[in-house]
Curated annotation (Swiss-Prot):
Belongs to the bacterial ribosomal protein bL31 family. Type A subfamily. It holds the Pfam family Ribosomal_L31. Residues 1-48 form a transit peptide. Part of the 50S ribosomal subunit. InterPro entries: Ribosomal_bL28/bL31-like_sf, Ribosomal_bL31, Ribosomal_bL31_sf. This is Large ribosomal subunit protein bL31c. Its main location: plastid. Disulfide bonds: none annotated. It comes from Arabidopsis thaliana (Mouse-ear cress). The gene is RPL31.
């Protein structure tokens, strides 16, 4: 399933539009008559990007998750490989998702606490359990 993401920022043309600047109109007075001289329009182009410094931008970059094409977007690489995307992440799926547990974390836990299983066994007691009685405290007051 391929999903195209429209993004107005990514669709901007990389070329900066040219700015047209007009020279001011100059007025000259000849013999009491005012004549106007107009200068020709000049085009000034301003670019802030240095050539061969910025990465090439690909309009149709493909995003793969578990070997399946999940969306098409723009980016500096032709294709991206991701482990989690909004289609399989529990945060976005809500009640439809199963609990996602990373197997590596479970294995780390088992390795770390493998030796504690012998210590952590709870002994089974047989017979009566006798609780010690509490000692009564003396009357409250000042001692002399």
């Amino acid at each position: 399933m391929a999903v195209s993401l429209p993004n107005s920022f990514l669709q901007i043309s990389p070329c900066v539009p040219s700015l047209q600047l007009r020279k001011p109109v100059m007025a000259a007075v000849k013999g009491g008559k005012q004549s106007v001289r107009r200068s020709s329009n000049t085009v000034v182009q301003i670019t802030c990007r240095k050539k061969e410094l910025h990465p090439e931008f690909h309009e149709d970059a493909k995003v793969y998750c578990n070997g399946e094409l999940v969306m098409t977007t723009g980016g500096t690489k032709k294709e991206y490989v991701v482990d989690v995307w909004s289609g399989n992440h529990p945060f976005y799926l809500g009640n439809r998702s199963a609990l996602m547990v990373d197997a590596d974390q479970v294995e780390k836990f088992r390795k770390r606490f493998a030796g504690l299983s012998e210590i952590m066994e709870i002994p089974v007691l047989k017979g009566e359990i006798i609780m010690p009685t509490k000692k009564s405290k003396g009357p409250k007051g000042k001692k002399k």
